[in-house]
Amino acid sequence: MVSSKKPKEKKARSDVVVNKASGRSKRSSGSRTKKTSNKVNIVKKKPEIYEISESSSSDSVEEAIRGDEAKKSNGVVSKRGNGKSVGIPTKTSKNREEDDGGAEDAKIKFPMNRIRRIMRSDNSAPQIMQDAVFLVNKATEMFIERFSEEAYDSSVKDKKKFIHYKHLSSVVSNDQRYEFLADSVPEKLKAEAALEEWERGMTDAG
């Protein structure tokens, strides 16, 4: 005999709780979702502040600033015993050449090779010792210094601030020591005076 009674439907346990006040449903068993904040934490870089005591001198402040500049430069940074860094600039090849040239110029003022080349222009002296070239170099230097000083004295007498050609020629014409330069540094003459001198020379020769 078949029973006409319908099986009782099992009521599903509702895990939904109705909030009467708001009318919204919330799951009691479900975990509440936490809203993550989209705020980005911005870290502000604080400016560097140097604390200087009243007893510190200005020299220590300058050394600290130099130490910071040395770190930014391309030089080598070395640390002292007190922890301060000091920049040591590296020497380039150009600076080394200038230093070597300065050491050589302290002894002589004219290139030795050029003096040797001038001395070798005469075939009578094919071999020249280094000390002879050095002495000729120093003698040339002393001669030019003495000649320039006397030309300067001549410009002072002429009330001029610069040395002109006439001052050099006056030194050559007035001093017998420079007579060998008479053909190289002759006095400037006007055309009329030069013509009279030439005619006088021709009459004396005739």
From Swiss-Prot:
Instruction: Cite the record's Low complexity compositional bias ranges.
Output: 50-59
BP-aspect Gene Ontology terms: positive regulation of DNA-templated transcription; regulation of DNA-templated transcription; response to heat; response to water deprivation
Biased amino acid composition, Basic and acidic residues:
63-72
Specify whether Glycoprotein is a keyword of the entry: no
Give the primary localization class.
nucleus
Induction field: Enhanced by heat stress but repressed by dehydration stress in young seedlings but not in older plants.
* Compositional bias annotation for Basic residues: 1-11, 23-37
Q: Where does this one sit in the cell?
A: Nucleus
Motif Nuclear localization signal, residue range(s) on this chain: 33-40
Q: Which GO terms describe its cellular component?
A: nucleus
**Matching Pfam families, A to Z?**
CBFD_NFYB_HMF (PF00808)
Disordered as annotated region, ranges: 1-108
Q: Tell me, according to the record, the phenotype of the null mutant.
A: Reduced expression of heat stress-inducible genes leading to an enhanced sensitivity to heat stress. Impaired ability of GAPC to enhance heat tolerance of seedlings and to promote the expression of heat-inducible genes.
Keywords attached to this Swiss-Prot or TrEMBL record, sorted alphabetically, are:
Nucleus
Listed PANTHER family: DNA POLYMERASE II SUBUNIT B3-1 (PTHR10252:SF93), HISTONE-LIKE TRANSCRIPTION FACTOR CCAAT-RELATED (PTHR10252)
**How does the annotation summarize its subunit structure?**
Interacts with DREB2A in the nucleus during heat-stress. Component of a heat stress-inducible transcriptional complex with NF-YA and NF-YB subunits made, at least, of NFYA2, NFYB3 and DPB3-1 in cooperation with DREB2A. Binds directly with NFYB1, NFYB2, NFYB3, NFYB6, NFYB7, and DPB4. Binds to GAPC in response to heat-stress; this interaction promotes DNA-binding ability to its target promoter.
Q: What's this protein's name?
A: DNA polymerase II subunit B3-1
Organism annotation = Arabidopsis thaliana (Mouse-ear cress)
Gene name of the record: DPB3-1
